[in-house]
Amino acid sequence: MPKVRTKDIIEQFQLELVSGAEGIYRPITTSDLSRPGIEMAGYFAYYPAERLQLLGRTELSFYETLTPEEKRARMQRLCTDITPGIIVSRGLDVPPELIEASERQSVPVMRSTMKTTRLSSRLTNYLESKLAPTTAVHGVLVDVYGVGVLITGKSGVGKSETALELVKRGHRLVADDCVEIRQEDEDTLIGSAPELIEHLLEIRGLGIINMMTLFGAGAVLPHKRISLVIDLELWDPEKQYDRLGLEEEKMKILDIELPRLTIPVRPGRNLAVIVEVAAMNFRLKRMGVNAAEEFSARLSDAIEEGERD
């Protein structure tokens, strides 16, 4: 799992570090946040100390009603050796008892001018993106008519050449050769290129070319949701290929199954056009239009009419 540290949160959201600077390299292992309201009342039985703690106006206004002894006790229990950080929102004053306890336990205390709800939402989205399960797939990812198409297949089958032709036809390259994929949701896979090979495409005989330099910024994308997998394979005359499109193959990446099409490759086939049509047909299916099923229904009706005659 990728590591996120408190220091990354400070830099990403431009937080003010108030105290506990020694702990800014503590790891953040979950995207869940905690607003320790009931803990301020003294109930720590289920205190999620491993989460980022977020203190807003509600928590701090209740905190001000406590006695000095209770204030010190609450903050000492709030700051543990596994707490990645405590953030005070709305630019509110940080209680001196919190500063004292955080320095003792090296728990970073930060302050943000954002409203609590907005800060919570942005933190959650950022952490879910950074802590999402990841994998890498050998292939090419292209944005075709707004559909993220992952082109797979053995080396030399023509994946990069197909991507080059697609870019020339106005589509956008996301990644070539190695596609880093992260699962951001129960049904969402996001693909991107490793930083080392971003915007680069390898063509046998030409070498490595920079697609952004060659075709402009509109020819590339930093990341794209993957919706369709197209597997290119050399034409096997002994194999029966799907000619109707009624049976839908699936490919599982991480915990998500994606629709997959197997396209046989042989000289004379325009793969770029086939990929374009596959992407458009995929969009039509999502809109409820399935040409294969319509043909099958018409064929069944024709057979029934013939039998009656």
UniProtKB/Swiss-Prot annotation:
Ranges for region Important for the catalytic mechanism of dephosphorylation: 264-269
Annotated GO biological process: regulation of carbohydrate metabolic process
Binding site for Mg(2+): S160, E202
Entry keyword annotation includes Kinase: yes
One GO MF term attached to the UniProt entry: phosphorelay sensor kinase activity
Disulfide bridge positions per record: none
Keywords (A to Z) from UniProt: ATP-binding, Carbohydrate metabolism, Kinase, Magnesium, Metal-binding, Multifunctional enzyme, Nucleotide-binding, Serine/threonine-protein kinase, Transferase
Entry superkingdom: Bacteria
Binding site for ATP: G153, K154, S155, G156, V157, G158, K159, S160
Known EC number: 2.7.11.-, 2.7.4.-
Reaction it catalyzes: [HPr protein]-L-serine + ATP = [HPr protein]-O-phospho-L-serine + ADP + H(+); [HPr protein]-O-phospho-L-serine + phosphate + H(+) = [HPr protein]-L-serine + diphosphate
The keyword Kinase is annotated on this UniProt entry: yes
Active site: H138, K159, D177, R243
Cofactor(s) listed in the protein's UniProt record: Mg(2+)
UniProt region (Important for the catalytic mechanism of both phosphorylation and dephosphorylation), positions on chain: 201-210
Its job: Catalyzes the ATP- as well as the pyrophosphate-dependent phosphorylation of a specific serine residue in HPr, a phosphocarrier protein of the phosphoenolpyruvate-dependent sugar phosphotransferase system (PTS). HprK/P also catalyzes the pyrophosphate-producing, inorganic phosphate-dependent dephosphorylation (phosphorolysis) of seryl-phosphorylated HPr (P-Ser-HPr).
The record's note on its domains: The Walker A ATP-binding motif also binds Pi and PPi.
Family: Belongs to the HPrK/P family.
SUBUNIT field: Homohexamer.
Protein's recorded name: HPr kinase/phosphorylase
